[in-house]
Amino acid sequence: MNKKIGKFMIYFTLICGGILSTTPFVWMLVTSLKTMGESTQIPPTMFPSKVMWNNYVEVFKLLPFGKYFINTLLSTLIMVIGQLVFCSMAGYAFARLQFWGKKKIFLVFLTILMVPGQIYLIPQYLIIQKLGLLNSLTALFLPGLFSAFGTFLLKQFFETIPRELEEAAIIDGCNPFQIYWRVMLPLIKPALITLAILTALYGWNSLMWPLIVNTSASKMTLSAGLASLAGQRTTNIPIMMAGSLVAMAPMLIFFIIFQKNFIEGIASTGSKG
Amino acid sequence: MKKIWILLLTLSVLFVGCGDKNNKEDKIVIKYGLWDSVQEPVFRDLADQFEKENPNIEIEIENTPYSQYWTKLQASSTGGVAPDVIWMNGPSIMKYTEHKMLLPLDEMVKKDSIDLGKYVKGIKELYNYKGVQYGIPKDVDSQALWYNKDLFDKAGVPYPKNDWTWDDMKKAAIEIQSKLEGVYGIAIPFYDDQGSFYNIIPQNDGFIISEGKKTSGYGNPEAIKAIQMMRDLIDEKASPDYTTILENKATEMFQSEKVAMTYQGSWRASPLNSDEKINTHIGVVKMPKIKKSTTVVHGIGYAITKGTKHPEASWEFIKFLASKKANDFIAKSGITIPAYVESQNLWASNYKNIDVTAHINALKDNISYPVSLDTAKWSHVQNEYLAQVWTGTMSAEEACKKIKVEMDEILKKEK
Amino acid sequence: MKNKKTEQAFWGYLLIMPVFLGLMIFYIIPFFQNFYFSFTEIGIFGGSTWVGLDNYKKIFVDKEFWQSLKNTFKYVIIAVPLGISISTVLAVLLNTKIKFKGLFRTIYFLPVIAMASASGAVWKWIYNKDFGILNFCLSFFGFEHISWLNNPTTSLYAVVVVMIWMKIGYNMIILLAGLQSIPKSLYEAAKIDGASEIRQFFFITLPLLTPSLFFVGIMTLISTFQVFDIIYMMVNKYSIAINESTSVVSLFYRYAFEFNEKGYASALAAILFFIIIMITLLQFHIKKKWVHE
């Protein structure tokens, strides 16, 4: 008997928690389909009496959401590719190659992780300003191409690969780059996927950096664009909700498809930490 | 080896963003900075017309949301990538002219015989600093009282009139709020100076900042009384409380028919006019009179940034935008009232459903928007203390006295 | 043999070159630049003047700063233990023999995927004084309508709820992985010895979970200290609650990019850095005392 009650309590708790977790999203959807007048009705309605699919069209008319989307997509994509390429190259070098100063340089990289991001913000902003890159696509992804965390993560994974696999390639006469490209890289695919996911999530949702470097309506990201919509003198709630869902949708779909990789990847950062 | 090419190709994706830079041969590109998404399409049309008449010039519009516009302008001016032609406004004009960030326009005005007398005087003067003209007036905003005819009918209250007094308005608001469930009488945008107290204080014969910009008017009994009168609207149940208005915004509440009256700026007329649910039963009258019947006007000016590489082309564009033809076009689109007086009536005629002539008439008795060298600093103090009055945590008298002290200090430091 | 050594060195430096250059230009040098800027005042339109310790002195006497620091500590002290406890409980529950584990994991992870702008927007609406669904539900219990986000007393706690909501799934996943790495044999041995489920939890699960708890603790602590996005989205600039809910980073953003006082803001960032470093070092120091190695 006790066991059954126990099981029931477990399900009950998890379901309650689940409801609390998802209610805001459900409410976002429901509100986005109402008219402005209905959204401010008391008592609030559970289902919109007139489904306003048009709100989603209005969002694109009110703000250049199409441009936001492209800016966010491109900058995130470039950041992911950049990090995968650069951090894997560096991670391999630190893991397997010998060169003078290697340990010291890596230590310096690690200290970057200890520092709160705000320290870098103003100087990075001024660099972008000096390069005349304020308000450009490049400004969005440039500092994000290089990651101490990514290097650290991939170095850890490279170190777990048995040396025998490399030895075979060395005997074949490959130089270190070929070993990296042909042998090592394919072997750390799970780590690459993890890094790609973490970087994509970070890039897509990032707010402060895009907010300060790109201020033209046509160069903003979804995150920053949504934030500036909220800050205006008037706010049409249903349209704001529709905009929020549109902004979230791509990452949501990406997550649902790659759920397993997301969860496994994030879980693994804990164990390697 | 093939794989190295793939690597290089990947790396070259990096330079996608760098392709932003314009490489148009022989054409002069003028960047035009503004902040209103409602007005942008109209200016795009005008820019296209200008480009047809001047085939060697291309206009690129940069729309920045207002909350970021000034930060961005400061940053891009420092970085040398500021737009050539910009929108300048009252709170910022003195800062920019004092730091010599704008091109003086007197010579060009004289050379092309532009008659600045054809523009609203208050706006022209706003952009004249120490005798030099830095901006050409673009538009003028005025405030008026907007009301919902249906809600007045439901409550059985007669419609507002152009000669209403503050007490008339309050009485009607209290009546509507008590009779109609879930509806408020009037929602004044307390958080918006131009929409509220910058009008109400002068209407009670007070002032915000002295003529010489040396002292604050908040110490005077007229100002204190005006603030108190605004607070009374909440206490006497003519208005929702501050938090409600703050969270839902006055215009939004009016648009969702939760409030019968609101004070509204002329630049807000366009979206309300296009809302079919409400535009059939809206009326507009002059703001109710207290001791006087004045309204604060503010208007944007076209200016040229100092760092521009194309001053002549920039001037040609401004000349075009300030012409009667362009102003008629702007007025007909209904987005804003031009500062060019002859075009103003066309703005009202654009509104088929709502009679907005009250906004034009309000221009007859106007005072200009209060500014100084460091407007942002003292208006921040002002808004912070007034917020306490609106939420009832500080009395009008105490708040105004505190504003006077701090504002005077800031003004003293300016000179 | 020498050839091999130079070959390794050549490729070593070449392969780290992009990351090395990038991190140098965008992180390492900026790190020192920030400290330099904190001793200067950067003009509105460029140019900087040395002001020595002026910025730090101004911060020291600034009431707003101390209030924001107090707020930030409040955020940390409430959100971190509460959030991690909830995540732990959920992880433990998910680790039992139940069905639909995958579905639950996904549902709890959803808030992590949402961007702060979107989450902030919907929660702001939920918290709305007159039309928000929270006040509507509470009114059934006789509660008056409260302005959760704009009332100075409640504002901070309202933000805390959202902060916890956004992070629960993330920590839960990491803790779940930690739980799954505990050998089942330990539990079996304990059961044979007659230990109850509760005893098992406190004497096996918790101690062996401490490495994961430590990791999650540090990550959550540091990120909570830096809270900005959600406050920016939810608390109105003209609200009287702004003082009671502003965090140090909110203040930093305001001075750096709204008031355009970048020297002062750099000093704020430097102070934040020292505080976080101190706390992190402290965490590592007491690690031996409670974390199972």
What are these regions (language model features)?
Chain C
Residues K4-E293:
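A structural signal for multi-pass alpha-helical bundles of membrane permease subunits
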